[in-house]
From Swiss-Prot:
Record protein name field: Aminoacyl carrier protein 1
Alphabetized Gene3D superfamilies for the sequence: ACP-like
Keywords: Phosphopantetheine, Phosphoprotein
Residues of the Carrier domain: 6-84
Function: Aminoacyl carrier protein. Can be charged with L-glycine via the formation of a thioester bond between the amino acid and the 4'-phosphopantetheinyl prosthetic group, catalyzed by the bll0957 ligase.
SUPFAM superfamilies linked to this entry: ACP-like
Organism for this UniProt entry: Bradyrhizobium diazoefficiens (strain JCM 10833 / BCRC 13528 / IAM 13628 / NBRC 14792 / USDA 110)
Length: 90
């Protein structure tokens, strides 16, 4: 399991908090907290997906748009880190 990346984690937390603020919600967003439990709706998840793509300048592959990857900041961070790593030749 790869170690967490503080910069990536903080940027994702900032995105989540921004969406919560737009909805006039405040929550303690921890890396392990389930995003639905802190108040994100399915539409918020779409906005979060778009925000992640814009923030990290990549398109999330269809195969990575799964409930498992959007469960928490931690799972999102793992997916982002995987996408940001340069492709290795087989």
């Amino acid at each position: 399991m790869q170690a967490f990346n503080t910069d990536v984690r903080n940027r994702i937390i900032k995105l989540v908090k921004g969406i919560l603020e737009q909805n006039a919600l405040a929550a303690d967003v921890t890396p392990q907290a389930k995003l639905v439990d802190v108040g994100l709706t399915s539409m918020d998840m779409v906005n979060l997906m778009l925000g992640v793509e814009a923030e990290f300048d990549f398109t999330i592959p269809q195969s990575e748009i799964t409930p498992e990857n959007f469960q928490s900041v931690e799972t999102l961070e793992r997916m982002v880190m995987t996408q940001l790593q340069p492709a290795t030749a087989a």
